[in-house]
């Protein structure tokens, strides 16, 4: 019996369905038109979200992936359509987000001729993706898609790019589903060395002042429960990286807060006082380590990670434990002895009190003056019972949101960590509403970041995406202005912002909105936002020259934090 003959575009549709895809984000164009034509017959199974710019498609796919744990998919045309996704691909690579970008390409016979909208997408994206492949034949579609999804989701997740030549979209081919669960040259889950585990166990059992650094690898490996079991048995306090904040509930007695330049005082100071440092699924980013020459020199360092290239890359490691966090944490928990570190844990308290008295109380509970950003974040977090998904943009809004929003559920934070991409928030929040339609999605952004991808309000309007947008408007590029104030003698070079009327913009898109200008209106505005079905834009006019504190100045040791500026 002969196999069914279908086009390469139809093979793509069936392959996506075979991978379990139900939602994709994209924008049509000439070189991808046959694929969109095939998609027309699959709209009952594949929900395509039409964005307003291809960068938005990539970020929406990221938001979808981060909250759902599934692979995000975007579909774009060649040339500028493909290059518009580059920022999102790079962002997904450094933040280990599984997305598959499918881009149209000129026909194979035109490759290398500088044809209309031809770009060497494979060449451009190889350094910023896990795998980049050009499909030139229709018969390769099913195999390429299966391989792409396997690579994107396995091991340390990341972006994959498929460059789909137009002739391969229209040519006919035999089709049958393909499954890929092994690639000879690719080891996504390396075997854990039992000797390394034994060495780690010995160090943990002997430790008097241990500290765990919790990274996003815990979330990516679905190891939240294993982490909690481990730290509770070992009685070890934790500091969380920006992307690892929701891996352990914020109110857990062992969660001592955020690490990094604008993190909490306790875990940053204690990094340079602990005797055993256990890094779990984190990469010792420069914003976490500060000055490397003085970073945790007194400690024995244990590093748990699935990616061997991260171990020893930035910080010398005494005991490397290779493997996925779920398995390695389970192994350690089984083998360690129950511990009590009451005195060590109590030593965090003075730093918590100092930070509250000198920073948090003033930022979150001011008695007078303009509204503070931290005050807004705390109020929204409380109003959502700390159960919402937090999506942030980049800058002061990001740091304030991540400092003062509280988490009770895993996979609850979506932000641009390593790349620091302004404009990330709005499209990523749209993606998050499709990835977890059962949860409230709160998108915190500044006036600078919103205007970078503001056209995606059109997507919000069309899809009736129930994203709750909290625009903290200070009429500045706030983070750059803060650095100009602290390190450049208050020379505010091109950081003041002239803004449009956001209420009129929201109205033009048919999005409910409210502007809050006084503290007395804040809680009412938040309640109106949360009680409104569908999207809502809450503009809060915040203090113009507010600063994010504490702060480790660039080039300083991680335990040196400014409490005022």
Question: Which residue stretches match the model-derived regions?
Answer:
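Active-site nucleophile and cofactor-binding loops and adjacent substrate-binding regions
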Residues: 27-29, 48-59, 74-81, 136-137, ...
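Generic enzyme active-site microenvironment
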Residues: 161, 303, 391, 444-445
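Short acidic/His/Gly/Ser-rich catalytic and metal-binding motifs that mark active-site loops
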Residues: 35, 171-174, 247-250, 355-357, ...
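Thiamine diphosphate
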Residues: 102, 110-117, 268, 312-314, ...
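Conserved short loop/turn motifs at secondary-structure junctions
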Residues: 215-219, 365, 446
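Phosphate/pyrophosphate-binding active-site segments
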Residues: 2-3, 139, 202, 298-394, ...
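N-terminal alpha/beta PP-like core and its mobile active-site loop of ThDP/TPP-dependent enzymes
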Residues: 2-343, 383-386, 459, 466-469, ...
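Active-site diphosphate/adenylate-binding microenvironment
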Residues: 9-22, 30, 35-40, 352-427
């Amino acid at each position: 019996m002969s196999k069914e003959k279908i086009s390469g575009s139809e093979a793509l549709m069936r392959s996506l369905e075979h991978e379990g895809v139900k939602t994709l984000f994209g924008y049509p164009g000439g070189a991808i038109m046959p694929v969109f034509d095939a998609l027309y017959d699959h709209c009952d199974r594949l929900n395509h979200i039409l964005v307003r710019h291809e960068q938005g498609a990539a970020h929406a796919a990221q938001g979808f992936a981060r909250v759902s744990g599934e692979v995000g998919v975007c579909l774009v045309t060649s040339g500028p359509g493909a290059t518009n996704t580059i920022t999102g691909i790079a962002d997904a690579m450094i933040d280990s987000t599984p997305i598959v970008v499918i881009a149209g390409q000129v026909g194979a016979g035109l490759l290398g001729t500088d044809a209309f909208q031809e770009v060497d997408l494979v060449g451009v994206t190889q350094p910023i993706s896990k795998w980049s492949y050009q499909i030139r034949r229709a018969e390769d579609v099913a195999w390429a898609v299966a391989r792409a999804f396997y690579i994107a989701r396995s091991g340390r997740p990341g972006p994959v790019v498929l460059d789909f030549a137009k002739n391969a979209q229209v040519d006919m081919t035999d089709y049958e589903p393909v499954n890929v669960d092994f690639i000879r040259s690719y080891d996504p889950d390396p075997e854990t060395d039992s000797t390394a585990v034994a060495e780690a166990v010995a160090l943990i059992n002997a430790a008097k002042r241990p500290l765990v650094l919790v990274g996003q690898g815990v979330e990516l490996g679905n190891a939240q429960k294993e982490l909690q079991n481990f730290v509770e048995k070992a009685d070890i306090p934790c500091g969380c990286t920006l992307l690892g904040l929701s891996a352990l509930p914020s109110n857990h007695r062992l969660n001592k807060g955020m690490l990094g330049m604008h993190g909490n005082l306790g875990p940053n100071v204690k990094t340079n006082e602990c005797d055993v440092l256990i890094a779990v699924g984190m990469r010792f980013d420069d914003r976490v380590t500060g000055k490397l020459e003085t970073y945790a020199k007194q400690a024995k360092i244990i590093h748990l990670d699935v990616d061997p290239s991260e171990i020893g890359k930035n910080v010398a490691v005494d005991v490397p434990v290779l493997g996925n966090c779920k398995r390695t944490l389970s192994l350690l928990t089984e083998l360690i002895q129950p511990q009590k570190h009451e005195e060590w844990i109590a030593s965090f308290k003075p730093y918590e009190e100092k930070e509250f008295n000198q920073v948090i109380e003033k930022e979150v509970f001011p008695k007078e003056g303009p509204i503070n950003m931290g005050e807004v974040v705390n109020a929204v977090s409380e109003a959502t019972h700390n159960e919402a998904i937090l999506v942030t943009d980049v800058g002061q809004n990001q740091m304030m949101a991540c400092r003062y929003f509280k988490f009770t559920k895993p996979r609850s934070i979506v932000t641009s960590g390593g790349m620091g991409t302004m404009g990330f928030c709005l499209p990523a929040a749209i993606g998050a509403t499709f990835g977890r339609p059962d949860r409230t999605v709160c998108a915190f952004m500044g006036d600078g970041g919103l205007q970078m991808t503001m056209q995606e309000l059109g997507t919000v309007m069309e899809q009736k995406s129930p994203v709750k947008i909290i625009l903290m408007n200070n009429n500045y590029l706030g983070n750059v202005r803060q650095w100009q104030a602290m390190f450049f003698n208050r020379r505010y070079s091109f950081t003041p912002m002239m803004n449009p009327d956001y209420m009129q913009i929201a109205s033009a898109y048919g999005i409910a909105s409210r502007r809050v200008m006084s503290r007395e209106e804040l809680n009412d505005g938040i309640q109106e936002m949360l009680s409104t079905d569908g999207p809502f834009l809450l503009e809060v006019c915040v203090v113009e020259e507010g600063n994010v504190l504490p702060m480790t100045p660039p080039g300083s040791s991680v335990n040196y934090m400014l409490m005022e500026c």
